[in-house]
């Protein structure tokens, strides 16, 4: 199973892979919420115009879309680093990988929640009914914010250690 006394470290390595999966799931959920809201905004009319023509709607989705794109890039970077870590030993250390993955795990669930929330607002009353996939998206995203594979504050500790060093960050 591994070297005696090193089980904790082996377990912690596994968290990075799991956090990539969690972040990817959240980004997929966020993307779907943005798509649903955009489709609805193109079809639904107010004052004779599609909702998408109102900047309050289009700018919200532009913000979410931009954050989604940036997080996809960061997640791809982190996944690539993990792949290299296992396929080319010595290419990266866990110390180099940890903060990248923590950033993704911290921000992706928040983006998924925010995307679901804004999509629900754009879709109005339909958005939070059981007939809408958005209410389920919100519940699913919240489970990742609350703690699956490490709560947001744990991710911030990992990132803080990268900034300040272990000796300057409380555990």
Predicted features, each with a name:
Residues 2-6, 10-171:
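Alpha-helical interface subdomain recognition
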């Amino acid at each position: 199973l591994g070297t005696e006394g090193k089980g904790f470290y082996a377990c912690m390595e596994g968290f990075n892979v799991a956090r990539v999966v969690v972040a990817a799931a959240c980004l997929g959920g966020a993307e779907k919420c943005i798509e649903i809201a955009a489709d609805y905004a193109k079809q639904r009319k107010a004052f004779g115009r599609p909702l998408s023509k109102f900047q309050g709607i289009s700018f919200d989705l532009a913000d979410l879309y931009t954050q989604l794109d940036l997080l996809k890039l960061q997640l791809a970077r982190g996944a690539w680093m993990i792949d290299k870590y296992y396929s080319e030993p010595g290419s990266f250390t866990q110390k180099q990988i940890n903060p990248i993955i923590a950033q993704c795990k911290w921000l992706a669930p928040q983006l998924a929640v925010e995307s679901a929330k804004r999509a629900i607002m754009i879709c109005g009353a339909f958005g939070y009914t059981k007939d809408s996939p958005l209410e389920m998206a919100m519940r699913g995203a919240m489970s990742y914010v609350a703690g699956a594979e490490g709560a947001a504050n744990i991710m911030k500790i990992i990132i803080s250690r990268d900034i300040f060093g272990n000796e300057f960050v409380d555990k």
